[in-house]
Every structure is written in C-alpha cells, then in structure tokens.
Regions:
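Signature for the C-terminal beta-barrel architecture of outer-membrane proteins
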Residues: 194-319, 324-329, 333-340, 347, ...
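Outer membrane beta-barrel transmembrane domains
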Residues: 258, 273-309, 330, 337, ...
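Surface-exposed coil loops of outer-membrane beta-barrel proteins
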Residues: 110-126, 130, 145-252, 256, ...
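Residue-level signature of outer-membrane beta-barrel architecture
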Residues: 85-87, 97, 138-140, 171, ...
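Hydrophobic, lipid-facing positions within transmembrane beta-strands of outer-membrane proteins
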Residues: 41, 75-81, 130-136, 165, ...
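Short loop/turn motifs that connect adjacent beta-strands in outer-membrane beta-barrel proteins
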Residues: 32-41, 55-56, 84-93, 141-164, ...
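Outer-membrane beta-barrel "beta-signal"
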Residues: 132-145, 372, 441-453
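Transmembrane beta-barrel strands of outer-membrane/channel proteins
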Residues: 43, 47-51, 95-99, 167-171, ...
C-alpha cells in the first residue's frame, strides 16, 4: 500500500479532491421540482479544489514580505459538512465541520488584494480538521405577507413573514451576515480575489481563518429595508488564529442598512456598512518613529509598538443591479481610517471594485457564468510613510516603496460539468503589487473544481 505521508502536498490534495468529487458527484441530486417546501433538518456538503500558478516577473528590488519574482504554484482544498436542525419554532442550530489544506504563494505575502478567498483556511500540505461554524439562528415573525425561503447551505427551506427579525449567536463569520452581493461574494463559485468576496478595506474582526464568536441581529421589513447590527470577536494578536474571547473589551462592531429596489423592472439592492474595531494594535506613526530611532534594527517595528488599545473604523457602499435575467453588475467602495495595522484581513485602506456576471444562456449554456471585475486598492498616508521608510508590515514590505494604487483585473468562466459540479478557469492581473510601481506587473492563472449537494 502506498505511503501517503510521502506524497507531495499538491499531489495529496489532488488525490483527495478527486476522491471527494467522485463521491459527491455520484450522490443522487434532488431535482428542483422535488425540493421540499419545509425542512426540519438539513445535511449538505461541499468540496472545492483551487490550483493557481504565477509566472515569474521582474522587480527592481525585493524585501522581507515581497511576492517572490520566481515562478510559483499554490493550491487549496476544502471539504465542509453543513448540518442543521430545526430545534423549536423559529430556532435553528447549525454545525459545520471542515477539512482544509493548501499552500499559498510566497508564504502569503506581497499583495494587498489576494488571489484566493480560500487561502486563509490552508495551513500546509497536511489536512487540518476543525469546527468552522456552530451557531443558533432564531427567527421571530412579525406579521404580514408570507414568503418562502429556499434551502441552501446553512439554510433550511420554510416560510417566514416578510416582516421578521433574525438573531444569530455563536461561532460564524461576519461575512455570513454582512456585505452580501448576488454577483461577487463566494470565492468557491464566483470571483476568487479577496476584494471581490467583500470590501478589501473591510478589516472585519475574525481569526486567521475568517471566523469568530459573536452575535448579529437583522430586521427584514416588508417594504424592502433591512437593518443589521453585530459584534464579533477578533484574534488575540493581529492576524493570528487564537481568538480573544473578551468580546466586551476587544471586538469588531458593524452596522448595515440595505434597501431593495427595481430599475426597469429588474431587482437591485444598495447597502451601506459601517464598522469599528477595538483591539491592541500598533499605530503606523508609532512604528515609524521607532524605526527611525533604531536604524539597522528589525524593520518590522509594528511588533514593538503594540502598546495600547486602538480604534479602527471604516464605511462602505455595496450596490448590485440586475440588467436582465442573465446579466448583473456590482460595485463596492470602502474607506478605512488606516492609522493602525491590519487587525484580521488584509493590507488595504481604501478599496473600489466593480464588475459583472453573465449567465451563459445566450450561447446555450444557461448554467455557466462569465464574470469580469476591476479593482483598485489604496493605502493611507500613515501606512504608506511607514513602508516607504523601509518598514515591514504583516503581509507586505518591499524594503522601499514607489507608491501607486494597486490595480487588479479578474475574469473567470464557470463551466457546469455535472449538476452541482463546476469547473472554473480564472485569470488575475496585478499592476503595482503591494502598491509598488517598482515591481511587477504580476499574472496569476487558476483552475477551480467545486461540487456541493
């Protein structure tokens, strides 16, 4: 029998992915017409394999946290079970165990907008098993016309009043509740770049995998308005995995207002999100002062000046609009204050993304999707000055900085292979990687295999 421990990580991931896809694809799929109107329990599964390659590129210089100029390959594999039960009237309990493995490009350094929304789950070439989610969702109906909720991952089919309140408590992701978008949200099925799964400047509180403990309340109104508020735990140390449980002391707060509308008979939504974090982090001005006072020392001086609790905040706009039944467009824009180091997401202080997704009905492939997006990421003056002086941050630091906004173009084509199974080709182009005009441009090409049932 072969020794799997001796297989290279990528080879083991491919073998595991193929086995998972064969099992999942062979499982009987329920036809849409057979979908139940009401469920008292749910058991669903997903598996996603992503492989990406980066050709070599040129750079005038490199630093400790630069993207490597040599050719590289990255991969991730995740497999998740989504279990749920309707425990009482309006009460739903969900549990998601997950397995993940993978290896990033350049040890996950050298970019602002990263290339794979799954990469934070990858902890190396050996499979890691962990609890991804464990939460309670309680719904209170407030009267009015009834509407049907379709079954999905972590969602059971049923009926609710159009006017209702939802409380979610437990272990989940901020992005499970906030900043939804029909065309740019899920890196397992849509765009892969971090700046297309949420605002790149949204430094939302979470552990290194993107999850935490907390609560969120949502009020859905019959007139199309939705109001959301929530608080989540963050990491004990910025960007690390262990969670800080002191949710009354260190936390991330967010509030979001959503309005549904129609333009030309086509649906759309507008969302405004504000957030505020409180945690022990370093300010870039303190880090720059320390760097200048200690020439020749460790340039990652943010680690030396985490000397007190800081506040970080931002505000963003999220728009989605259907053009017709096959084409939709989106826009996200956010500005953060940028005075302190990254708490839990990535090195972006201002972000803009816009794009669209087109279903393949026009060429006889109704279940296929083609998407294209443009992104622009910027840094605050404080972070920019620190990096230009030779400072090293958590994800970026070239030793110098010829500052320009980081610009990204992303395109994908998702091809339905079997029911509930898709193969996606993805391409991303990065100009001024990590905001440095002296490096790049960089291209990353990817393939994704995804199935769920």
């Amino acid at each position: 029998m072969p020794n799997l421990d001796r297989l290279p990580g990528c080879a083991l991931a491919i073998l595991t992915a193929l086995a998972a896809f064969l099992v999942l694809a062979a499982a009987p799929a329920r036809a849409a017409d057979d979908a139940p109107e009401h469920e008292d329990w749910t058991a669903r599964f997903q598996s996603t394999y992503i492989m990406q390659k980066k050709p070599g590129f040129t750079a005038r210089y490199s630093g400790a946290n630069s993207l490597l100029t040599t050719r590289e390959q990255s991969y991730t594999l995740s497999a998740t079970a989504h279990f749920g039960v309707r425990a009482w009237d309006g009460g739903e309990l969900y549990f998601n165990p997950e397995m993940a493995l993978g290896e990033p490009l350049s040890n996950l350094t050298g970019l602002g907008g990263y290339y794979n929304g799954e990469i934070t789950r990858a902890g190396g070439s050996n499979p890691t098993f962990y609890r991804q989610r464990l939460f309670l969702r309680q719904t209170w109906n407030l009267g009015g016309e009834r509407e049907h909720i379709d079954a999905d991952l972590n969602r059971m089919a049923g009926f609710v009043d159009r006017n209702h309140v939802v409380l979610t408590v437990g272990n989940f992701s901020t992005l499970d509740i906030f900043d939804d978008n029909a065309y740019a949200k899920d890196p397992r099925t849509q765009f892969m770049n971090w700046g297309n799964m949420t605002y790149a400047a949204y430094d939302y509180a979470a552990d290194a995998r993107g999850f935490g403990w907390g609560f969120a309340a949502e009020w859905y109104r019959a007139d199309g308005w939705v109001f959301r508020i929530g608080r989540m735990t963050g990491p004990r140390e910025p960007n690390m995995l262990p969670t800080d449980p002191r949710i009354g002391k260190h936390y991330g707060d967010q509030i979001e207002i959503e309005r549904a509308h129609e333009i030309g008979g086509q649906p759309g939504k507008v969302r405004v999100l504000g957030w505020r974090n409180r945690a022990v982090t370093a300010s870039f001005r303190d880090a720059l002062d320390y760097l200048r006072a200690n020439p020749g020392g460790d340039p990652q001086t943010i680690l030396k000046v985490r000397n007190g609790e800081k506040i970080k905040y931002g505000i963003g706009l999220n728009v989605e609009q259907a053009i017709d039944e096959n084409l939709g467009v989106f826009l996200r824009a956010m500005k953060a204050d940028g005075r302190t180091e990254t708490y839990a997401f990535t090195e972006v202080d201002g972000s803009l993304s816009l794009g669209g997704a087109l279903k393949g009905a026009a060429w006889g492939r109704a279940q296929d999707t083609f998407g294209v997006a443009l992104l622009r990421n910027t840094l605050s003056p404080d972070r920019r000055a620190y990096l230009a002086a030779g400072g090293i941050s958590f994800f970026i630091g070239d030793g110098a900085l010829n500052y320009r906004p980081e610009r990204i173009a992303e395109a994908y084509y998702s091809l339905e292979l079997l029911k509930n199974t898709t193969l996606t080709l993805n391409a991303q182009h990065f100009a001024n990687p990590a905001y440095n005009a002296d490096r790049g441009p960089v291209n990353i090409f990817g393939m994704r295999l995804h199935t769920e049932f």
